[in-house]
Amino acid sequence: MGWFIVFIMVITTTGNFWFTSQLSRSEHRHQAAENTQQAATFIRYMNAINDYLHQHQERRTAGGRLTSAQLGIPGTDTVSHIISQQRVFVWATETPGLMAALREQSNDSALLGRVENGRLLDTAGRALSITLPSVIPDHVILWMN
């Protein structure tokens, strides 16, 4: 009878390990898909702004923000932007894996970076000599043009 209890314990432990492993992989795939989707939204937002500014060049000089109606895309809570210094700054809160997804989808664009202590850092962590608008918070991923 003792061997039967040991057998059941081994089967239960193995099953628990397998289930936990599968759950972890599933969570990882879900996070990766979420990052890919957010990166696509980020890029779509930047492209819509650039398309709008190509047709309305006076807005690049005037600066400010554009509405989702002006851009012709659905609004998003995860991506923000501002037009300042005749540049477009688009940013999103940094989450694990988002930078990697953006680098992949943007072909490792040199215009991609992160903001730390009010300074723009490139993807390698080097400070860039670009003055950021004060509305851009720390700990965000930023793409500019």
Segments from the language model and where they lie:
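Short, surface-exposed interaction loops/tails
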Residues: 90-145
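Aliphatic-rich helix starts adjacent to a transmembrane/signal segment
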Residues: 16-40
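N-terminal pilin/flagellin-like segments and related low-complexity appendage regions
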Residues: 23, 28, 48-53, 57, ...
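Extracellular/periplasmic head regions of type IV pilus-like filament subunits
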Residues: 54-107
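Short, contiguous, well-ordered secondary-structure segments
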Residues: 9-12, 30, 51
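N-terminal single-pass transmembrane signal-anchor helix
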Residues: 1-25
